[in-house]
């Protein structure tokens, strides 16, 4: 323990420093106010003070309750029964005299008990000896009687013998009497000796017993008694008081009590006083509270989680919320009392106020759950099949290539011939098994391609020999490099006449993909998905690359993997396509998957067959999750379903808190930008898709379409069919409903018809994005353009009583039309802009005058037309704007 100074010790025990120094001096320790005090010196001082002032005597507090019924006569003549409860409290103190008397009494009782026990043992032994002597005497008497009967015949002869017998009997009686007296004397001596030893023990214990001092309290009512007689007398006194009270009540002399003005007197005290009929003065009570304001600031240990509201932080520090907000304003942060702040901000605020911060890790339960897993550490890692992701630009033949390898017709089943989902398949070849992931090539599926690159071992980059490197090809290269995955290039459509593989190599080399023949690390294989050219070479190249990577995994133990895709099936519930990466996934396992959890109720392979287990690099569909997980979430098998549920709920709450904190922060930072939001048009959309990945891709693509004038707002999105809830949401928010590979049920269609909603179905993402663009274009404010349609040169000016100044003009360009807006130019400078009011040719009103003809032009509300001016006639054209 750290030593403290005399001054700090005096402040701690709230005593003057001079008095504490004097007490140390009395205890034989010389100290000044700046000297340090050790723990041993504290104990010496405490022992000295105990000797001087003594210790608090031991005390015992007893509480008693008595209940009775009091009949009070009322004005109506009927008596009123009142329940009376009297509570009494007695405190008994163990004083030195009581302790001494108790010790002597105890010693005396022990001595008496010991003496009684010894006496009983002596008496028992004496009784046994007496019984033996009586038996011997009885035998002697019987022998004597027998001898007497025998010698009766010779009475005369035996007279001297009888005299001897009487003498012997007298001697035996005298001996018996002397033995009894000796025994009684010994018992009395033993009892005296035991009593003397008991008194000596009591005297020794009296010296060893601690000497208590009476407690120095003025208000305590201590009854120093422990005997049964004292308690009996007290009970008699209570009964007497109660009897007097009853007699006074029956006599109708209930005493009025004075109303006290003590705020501290309770209703129970008043009832007790009324019951016992007290007339005397009540015990005065103080009206001040016992709380003393802390003199020194209290420094607390504040435990802060990853996120906390301002109100919770103030509660932890025992201060008002306004004080926390004030401290945050000093640090340059604005917040409300219900706002969620992050851990770093809360730490700065708590330290600013002066408290010690303890940062808490809130994912302890998750760490404990993950540590309690059988991951098969003792088992040896075995070779596993490579996971190959096929990437490339749209329509470059990725699915067709995989289709030829699998010998199925997957490409024909895709809407529009393009892949909308990540397809996961494993293929058995002659040289081993390969797992393929087919990713979409459309720009909208960027996140799906990135997800495929994270879960893969090898990327097969498909490039069309006749098309070359395209934008999605470059994006696929970036994903592969970010994931640090080797790339095998498949130059497809090599059978076309316009194929140019060398151009593909040259273009890819600009992005860091160098072929092996040029000294690089990437294998280039020329293939044709239609003709089947180079397929075996491609598979061998993949297996060769996998052999170089030495891919291994533990097959035993609890499995973990990644969600490739997920969707909601109407009959089966949430379905997730999972790629197992470690261990073995069995039917019935408890899995934790992102925000969701559940037990694997069924497992199916890519062909729809039910299976019971799946090892590393095997893609499977699992059923039994609580909801549809997000694609890309990690799947982990755990032991306890209850803990898995707690972790999933914690993750959901954590995600919500972080999202809310991020929204609050962005609101404050973008305050000025949000002031102009009222001028922006919004297109509200509700999106429902068949799988999670497509839903994400569509939402990202539509949000990227937002401009400064039209903003796309995704009101709702989800997986599964369009329900009545979706239709109601769209009706409330004025949104259009877009279904991607899903349909609306009967109740939803009924709401759509009733509310007149716009419901559209799509199976190709191109069409969906194009139509949303058209809808956004219709919401744009129109753009107007001025187009000059004719020029007329003023040759002469003459007056008209009806129109004023009339300009005689020659049309030099275009056509002059009546009632069109015009400009008057003088020296190529616009001096007036107005409207053409009158157009005549040979005194006839005409609607238009063409190039090379003369006409008279009257300008509305303008008479300052001069010779040499140019009249420019134009029209305003509305240009329809579109979203780029």
From Swiss-Prot:
Ranges of compositional bias, category Polar residues: 216-229
Domain of life of the source: Bacteria
Keyword check for Nucleotide-binding: yes
Region (G3): 438-441
Subcellular location(s) per record: Cytoplasm
Protein name: Translation initiation factor IF-2
Family statement drawn from the similarity comment of this UniProt entry: Belongs to the TRAFAC class translation factor GTPase superfamily. Classic translation factor GTPase family. IF-2 subfamily.
One Pfam family, short name: IF-2
Gene that encodes the chain: infB
Annotated segments matching region G1: 392-399
Cross-referenced InterPro entries: DNA-bd_dom_put_sf, EF-G-like_DII, EFTu-like_2, IF2_assoc_dom_bac, IF2_II, IF2_N, P-loop_NTPase, Small_GTP-bd
Alphabetized GO MF terms: GTP binding; GTPase activity; guanosine tetraphosphate binding; translation initiation factor activity
Biased composition (Basic residues): 247-261
Disordered: annotated segments: 93-288
Biased composition (Basic and acidic residues): 99-209, 231-246, 262-275
Binding site for GTP: 392-399, 438-442, 492-495
Biological source species: Yersinia pestis bv. Antiqua (strain Angola)
């Amino acid at each position: 323990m750290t030593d403290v100074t005399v001054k700090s010790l005096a402040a701690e025990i709230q005593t003057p420093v001079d008095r504490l120094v004097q007490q140390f001096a009395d205890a034989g320790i010389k100290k000044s106010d700046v000297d340090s005090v050790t723990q041993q010196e504290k104990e010496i001082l405490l022992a000295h003070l105990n000797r001087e002032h003594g210790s608090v005597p031991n005390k015992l507090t007893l509480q008693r309750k008595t209940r009775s019924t009091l009949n009070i006569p009322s004005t109506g003549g009927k008596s009123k029964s009142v329940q009376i409860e009297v509570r009494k409290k007695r405190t008994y103190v163990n004083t030195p005299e009581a302790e001494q008397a108790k010790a002597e009494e105890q010693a005396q009782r022990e001595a008496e008990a010991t003496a009684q026990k010894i006496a009983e043992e002596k008496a028992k032994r004496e009784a046994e000896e007496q019984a033996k002597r009586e038996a011997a005497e009885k035998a002697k008497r019987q022998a004597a009687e027998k001898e007497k009967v025998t010698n009766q015949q010779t009475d005369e002869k035996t007279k001297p013998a009888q005299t001897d017998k009487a003498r012997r009997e007298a001697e035996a009686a005298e001996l018996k009497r002397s033995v009894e007296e000796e025994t009684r004397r010994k018992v009395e001596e033993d009892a005296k000796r035991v009593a003397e030893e008991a008194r000596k023990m009591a005297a020794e214990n009296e010296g060893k017993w601690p000497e208590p001092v009476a407690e120095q309290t003025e208000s305590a009512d201590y009854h120093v008694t422990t005997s049964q007689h004292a308690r009996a007398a007290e009970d008699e006194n209570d009964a007497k008081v109660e009897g007097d009270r009853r007699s006074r009540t029956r006599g109708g002399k209930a005493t009025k009590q004075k109303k006290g003005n003590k705020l501290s007197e309770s209703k129970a005290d008043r009832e007790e006083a009324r019951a016992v009929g007290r007339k005397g003065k009540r015990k005065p009570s103080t009206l001040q509270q016992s709380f003393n304001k802390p003199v020194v600031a209290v420094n607390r240990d504040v435990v802060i989680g990853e996120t906390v509201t301002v109100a919770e932080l103030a509660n932890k520090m025992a201060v008002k919320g306004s004080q926390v907000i004030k401290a945050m304003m000093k640090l340059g942060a604005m917040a409300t009392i219900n706002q969620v702040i992050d851990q770093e901000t809360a730490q700065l605020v708590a330290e600013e106020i002066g408290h010690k911060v303890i940062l808490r890790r809130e994912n302890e339960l998750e760490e404990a759950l993950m540590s309690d897993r059988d991951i098969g550490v003792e088992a040896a890692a075995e070779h596993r099949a490579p996971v190959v992701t096929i990437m490339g630009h749209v329509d470059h033949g990725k699915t067709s290539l995989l289709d030829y390898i699998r010998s199925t017709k997957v490409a024909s089943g895709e809407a529009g011939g393009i892949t909308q989902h990540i397809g996961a398949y494993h293929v058995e070849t002659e040289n081993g098994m390969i797992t393929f992931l087919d990713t979409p090539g459309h720009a909208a599926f960027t996140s799906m391609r990135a997800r495929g690159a994270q879960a893969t071992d090898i990327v097969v980059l498909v490039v069309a020999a006749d098309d070359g490197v395209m934008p999605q090809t470059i994006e696929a290269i970036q994903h592969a490099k970010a994931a640090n995955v080797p790339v095998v290039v498949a130059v497809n459509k090599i059978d076309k006449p316009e194929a140019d593989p060398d151009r593909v190599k040259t273009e890819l080399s600009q992005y860091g993909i160098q072929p092996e023949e040029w000294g690089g690390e990437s294998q280039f294989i020329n293939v044709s998905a239609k003709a089947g050219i180079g397929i075996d070479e491609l598979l061998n190249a993949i297996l060769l690359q996998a052999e170089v990577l030495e891919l291994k995994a533990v097959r035993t133990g609890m499995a973990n993997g990644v969600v490739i895709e997920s969707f909601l099936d109407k009959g089966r519930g949430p379905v997730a396509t999972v790629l197992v990466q470690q261990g073995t996934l069995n039917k019935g396992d408890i899995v934790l998957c992102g925000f969701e959890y559940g037990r694997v109720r069924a497992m199916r392979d890519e062909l729809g067959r039910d299976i019971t287990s799946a090892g590393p690099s095997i893609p499977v569909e699992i059923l039994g999750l609580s909801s549809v997980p997000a694609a890309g979430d990690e799947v982990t098998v755990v032991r306890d379903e209850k803990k898995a549920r707690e972790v999933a709920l914690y993750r959901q709450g954590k995600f919500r808190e972080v999202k809310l904190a991020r929204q609050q922060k962005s609101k404050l930072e973008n305050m000025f930008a949000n002031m102009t939001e009222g001028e922006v048009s919004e297109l509200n959309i509700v999106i429902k898709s068949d799988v999670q990945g497509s839903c994400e891709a569509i939402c990202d693509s539509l949000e990227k379409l937002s401009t400064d004038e039209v903003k796309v707002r995704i009101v709702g999105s989800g997986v599964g069919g369009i329900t009545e809830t979706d239709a109601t949401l769209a009706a409330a928010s004025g949104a259009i409903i877009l279904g991607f590979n899903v349909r609306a049920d009967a109740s939803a269609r009924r709401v759509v018809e009733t509310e007149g909603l716009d419901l559209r179905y799509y199976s190709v993402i191109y069409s969906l994005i194009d139509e949303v663009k058209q809808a956004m274009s219709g919401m744009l404010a129109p753009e107007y353009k001025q187009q000059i349609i004719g020029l007329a040169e003023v040759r002469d000016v003459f007056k008209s009583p009806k129109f004023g100044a009339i300009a005689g003009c020659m049309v030099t360009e275009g056509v002059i039309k009546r009632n069109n807006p015009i400009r008057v130019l003088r020296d190529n400078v616009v001096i007036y802009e107005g409207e053409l009011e009158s157009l005549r040719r040979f005194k006839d009103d005409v609607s238009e005058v063409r190039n090379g003809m003369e006409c008279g032009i009257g300008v509305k509300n303008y008479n300052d037309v001069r010779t040499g001016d140019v009249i420019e006639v134009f029209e305003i054209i509305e240009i329809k704007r579109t979203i780029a």
